[in-house]
Amino acid sequence: MKNVDLVIIGGGPAGLAAACKAWESGLRDILILERDKELGGILNQCIHNGFGLHRFGEQLTGPEYAGRFIEMLKDTGVKVQLDTMVLEVTPEKKVHCVSKEYGYQIIEAKSIVLGMGCRERTRGAIGTPGTRPAGVYTAGAAQRYVNMEGYLVGKRVLILGSGDIGLIMRSEERR
């Protein structure tokens, strides 16, 4: 069993900020567990400006904002395990996880930060009718396809909703 002072579950904005702050506060035995193949979480698909003004004093895109935290971590001893799925967190602060590189592990921590972020609700959870709505994407899925994978989601696009993410998608769709 591996023992660490702090396990941070999630390598998105919350997890990265928590790791930087813990390091700045003097904690040295820190491990980030991230299920994706890269750090940054949702920020990686947010190519619009609007991040970093308070923390870094300038407007950054999501990937730029994540990159700043990742660069800050390179100057520390914070350890990172990518492509790692957390299976269970026990009341005794034991984190059960699995990855291709490390296999099944139990990591005992003095403290745990839950920084898993959020996921969009599924098609069923938001009440999209039908059994297979071809060409219907959530905003997050569309952002990922367009901004990260380089795919077009359609020649003609209809955006349903006028919240922040709908307006952001509209501005991205026009590029």
Set out the residue ranges of the language-model regions.
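Gly/Ala-rich phosphate-binding loop of Rossmann-like dinucleotide-binding domains
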Residues: A19, W23-E24, R170
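Glycine-rich Rossmann-fold phosphate-binding loop(s) that bind the pyrophosphate
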Residues: G10-A14, G161-G163
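FAD-binding core/adjacent interface of flavoenzyme oxidoreductases
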Residues: M1-I9, G67-R156
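Glycine-rich flavin
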Residues: K37-L39, L43-Q45, N49-Q59
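Glycine-rich FAD pyrophosphate-binding loop
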Residues: E24-N44
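Short beta-strand to alpha-helix junction loop
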Residues: G52-E71, L160
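Conserved small/polar residues in nucleotide/adenosyl-binding loops
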Residues: E173-R174
